[in-house]
Amino acid sequence: MSFVVKKRNMKKIIAVFILVVTFSINAQEKQFTTKALNDVLLTEEGAEIIFSDILETYKGKTILIDIWAGWCSDCIKGMPKVKKLQKKNKNVVFLFLSLDKTEENWQKAIKTFKIKGEHYYLASGWKGAFCSTIDLDWIPRYIIVNPEGEIVLYKAIKADDPRIESVLKGL
Protein backbone atom coordinates (compact mmCIF):
# COMPACT_ATOMS: atom_id res chain seq x y z
CA MET A 1 0.00 0.00 0.00
CA SER A 2 2.70 2.51 0.93
CA PHE A 3 4.59 1.70 -2.28
CA VAL A 4 1.50 2.65 -4.37
CA VAL A 5 1.07 5.93 -2.45
CA LYS A 6 4.76 6.79 -2.89
CA LYS A 7 4.54 6.02 -6.61
CA ARG A 8 1.50 8.32 -6.99
CA ASN A 9 3.23 11.09 -5.06
CA MET A 10 6.33 10.70 -7.20
CA LYS A 11 4.21 10.99 -10.38
CA LYS A 12 2.64 14.19 -9.02
CA ILE A 13 6.03 15.63 -8.14
CA ILE A 14 7.39 14.84 -11.60
CA ALA A 15 4.30 16.35 -13.27
CA VAL A 16 4.64 19.56 -11.23
CA PHE A 17 8.36 19.73 -12.02
CA ILE A 18 7.70 19.38 -15.75
CA LEU A 19 5.06 22.13 -15.60
CA VAL A 20 7.38 24.50 -13.73
CA VAL A 21 10.23 23.92 -16.19
CA THR A 22 7.93 24.35 -19.20
CA PHE A 23 6.43 27.60 -17.90
CA SER A 24 9.80 29.05 -16.95
CA ILE A 25 11.20 28.33 -20.40
CA ASN A 26 8.17 29.88 -22.12
CA ALA A 27 8.13 32.87 -19.78
CA GLN A 28 11.63 33.94 -20.78
CA GLU A 29 11.51 36.91 -23.11
CA LYS A 30 13.29 36.30 -26.36
CA GLN A 31 15.66 38.93 -27.64
CA PHE A 32 17.34 39.42 -31.00
CA THR A 33 20.54 37.42 -31.32
CA THR A 34 23.83 38.96 -32.43
CA LYS A 35 23.37 37.09 -35.71
CA ALA A 36 19.95 38.69 -36.27
CA LEU A 37 21.21 42.14 -35.26
CA ASN A 38 24.05 41.88 -37.80
CA ASP A 39 21.90 40.75 -40.73
CA VAL A 40 22.01 43.13 -43.70
CA LEU A 41 18.77 44.59 -45.04
CA LEU A 42 18.13 47.06 -47.85
CA THR A 43 16.50 50.46 -47.58
CA GLU A 44 13.93 51.64 -50.12
CA GLU A 45 16.77 53.56 -51.77
CA GLY A 46 18.80 50.35 -52.14
CA ALA A 47 21.39 51.11 -49.45
CA GLU A 48 22.58 48.32 -47.16
CA ILE A 49 21.88 48.65 -43.44
CA ILE A 50 22.33 46.22 -40.58
CA PHE A 51 19.32 45.43 -38.44
CA SER A 52 20.87 46.79 -35.23
CA ASP A 53 21.29 50.19 -36.92
CA ILE A 54 17.60 50.17 -37.83
CA LEU A 55 16.66 49.48 -34.20
CA GLU A 56 19.08 52.17 -33.01
CA THR A 57 17.40 54.70 -35.33
CA TYR A 58 14.11 54.21 -33.48
CA LYS A 59 15.47 53.69 -29.96
CA GLY A 60 13.24 55.42 -27.43
CA LYS A 61 10.13 54.58 -29.47
CA THR A 62 7.83 51.60 -29.54
CA ILE A 63 8.34 49.56 -32.72
CA LEU A 64 5.90 47.15 -34.33
CA ILE A 65 7.76 44.93 -36.78
CA ASP A 66 5.64 43.40 -39.55
CA ILE A 67 7.41 40.67 -41.52
CA TRP A 68 5.47 40.24 -44.73
CA ALA A 69 5.58 39.74 -48.52
CA GLY A 70 3.46 40.89 -51.44
CA TRP A 71 2.87 37.27 -52.50
CA CYS A 72 1.53 36.29 -49.06
CA SER A 73 -2.28 36.26 -49.02
CA ASP A 74 -2.45 36.25 -45.20
CA CYS A 75 -0.15 39.30 -45.14
CA ILE A 76 -2.36 41.18 -47.57
CA LYS A 77 -5.54 40.19 -45.70
CA GLY A 78 -3.97 41.58 -42.53
CA MET A 79 -2.97 44.94 -44.02
CA PRO A 80 -6.31 46.72 -43.33
CA LYS A 81 -5.96 45.66 -39.69
CA VAL A 82 -2.37 46.93 -39.59
CA LYS A 83 -3.57 50.25 -41.03
CA LYS A 84 -6.16 50.47 -38.23
CA LEU A 85 -3.40 49.84 -35.70
CA GLN A 86 -1.39 52.64 -37.31
CA LYS A 87 -4.30 55.07 -36.96
CA LYS A 88 -4.81 54.13 -33.29
CA ASN A 89 -1.10 54.20 -32.43
CA LYS A 90 0.43 57.27 -34.06
CA ASN A 91 3.38 57.19 -31.65
CA VAL A 92 4.42 53.67 -32.74
CA VAL A 93 6.99 53.12 -35.49
CA PHE A 94 5.71 50.55 -37.99
CA LEU A 95 8.67 48.72 -39.46
CA PHE A 96 7.86 46.55 -42.47
CA LEU A 97 10.43 43.86 -43.31
CA SER A 98 9.75 42.25 -46.67
CA LEU A 99 10.43 38.70 -47.76
CA ASP A 100 9.42 39.32 -51.36
CA LYS A 101 11.35 37.30 -53.90
CA THR A 102 12.90 40.38 -55.55
CA GLU A 103 13.49 44.02 -54.68
CA GLU A 104 11.30 45.00 -57.63
CA ASN A 105 8.37 42.93 -56.32
CA TRP A 106 8.88 44.47 -52.87
CA GLN A 107 8.77 48.03 -54.23
CA LYS A 108 5.66 47.21 -56.29
CA ALA A 109 3.88 45.69 -53.29
CA ILE A 110 4.50 48.79 -51.15
CA LYS A 111 2.85 50.94 -53.83
CA THR A 112 0.08 48.50 -54.74
CA PHE A 113 -1.08 48.06 -51.15
CA LYS A 114 -0.33 51.67 -50.15
CA ILE A 115 1.64 50.67 -47.07
CA LYS A 116 2.87 53.59 -44.98
CA GLY A 117 5.73 53.10 -42.58
CA GLU A 118 9.41 52.30 -42.58
CA HIS A 119 10.30 49.71 -45.22
CA TYR A 120 13.26 47.35 -45.46
CA TYR A 121 13.99 44.35 -47.63
CA LEU A 122 15.33 41.16 -46.06
CA ALA A 123 17.88 40.45 -48.77
CA SER A 124 19.08 37.30 -46.97
CA GLY A 125 15.59 35.83 -47.33
CA TRP A 126 13.64 33.35 -45.27
CA LYS A 127 16.72 31.23 -44.48
CA GLY A 128 18.94 34.18 -43.66
CA ALA A 129 20.34 35.06 -40.24
CA PHE A 130 17.46 37.30 -39.15
CA CYS A 131 14.61 34.95 -40.03
CA SER A 132 16.30 31.77 -38.85
CA THR A 133 17.18 33.22 -35.45
CA ILE A 134 13.67 34.51 -34.72
CA ASP A 135 12.14 31.10 -35.38
CA LEU A 136 10.21 32.40 -38.38
CA ASP A 137 7.76 29.73 -39.47
CA TRP A 138 4.90 31.84 -40.84
CA ILE A 139 4.18 35.26 -42.25
CA PRO A 140 2.84 37.68 -41.47
CA ARG A 141 4.73 37.82 -38.21
CA TYR A 142 4.43 40.67 -35.76
CA ILE A 143 7.02 41.54 -33.13
CA ILE A 144 6.81 44.48 -30.72
CA VAL A 145 9.92 46.16 -29.35
CA ASN A 146 9.62 48.57 -26.40
CA PRO A 147 11.38 51.98 -26.22
CA GLU A 148 14.33 50.34 -24.41
CA GLY A 149 14.89 48.04 -27.39
CA GLU A 150 13.56 44.88 -25.73
CA ILE A 151 11.15 42.48 -27.40
CA VAL A 152 7.87 42.57 -25.48
CA LEU A 153 5.81 40.54 -27.96
CA TYR A 154 7.85 37.89 -29.72
CA LYS A 155 5.29 36.22 -31.93
CA ALA A 156 1.89 37.08 -33.29
CA ILE A 157 0.72 35.92 -36.72
CA LYS A 158 -2.50 37.91 -37.04
CA ALA A 159 -2.77 41.68 -36.98
CA ASP A 160 -5.92 41.43 -34.88
CA ASP A 161 -4.25 39.27 -32.21
CA PRO A 162 -5.56 40.87 -28.99
CA ARG A 163 -2.06 40.73 -27.49
CA ILE A 164 -0.85 43.34 -30.00
CA GLU A 165 -3.31 46.01 -28.86
CA SER A 166 -2.85 45.04 -25.24
CA VAL A 167 0.95 45.37 -25.42
CA LEU A 168 0.76 48.65 -27.37
CA LYS A 169 -1.64 50.11 -24.79
CA GLY A 170 0.71 49.12 -22.00
CA LEU A 171 3.74 50.90 -23.47
Give short role names for the model-derived ranges.
Residues G70, T102, E150:
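Conserved Rossmann-like nucleotide-cofactor binding loop
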Residues I115, L122-K169:
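Thiol/disulfide oxidoreductase modules built on the thioredoxin-like
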Residues M1-Q31, L171:
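Bacterial Sec-dependent N-terminal signal peptides
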Residues K61-I63, I67-W71, W138:
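Short pre-active-site segment immediately N-terminal to redox-active cysteine/selenocysteine motifs
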Residues Q31, K87-K127, L136-I139:
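Conserved segment of the thioredoxin-like fold in thiol-based oxidoreductases
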Residues Q28-T57, E118, S166:
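N-terminal "domain-start" segment that seeds a small globular fold
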Residues I67-K84:
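Conserved redox-active cysteine motifs that mediate thiol-disulfide chemistry
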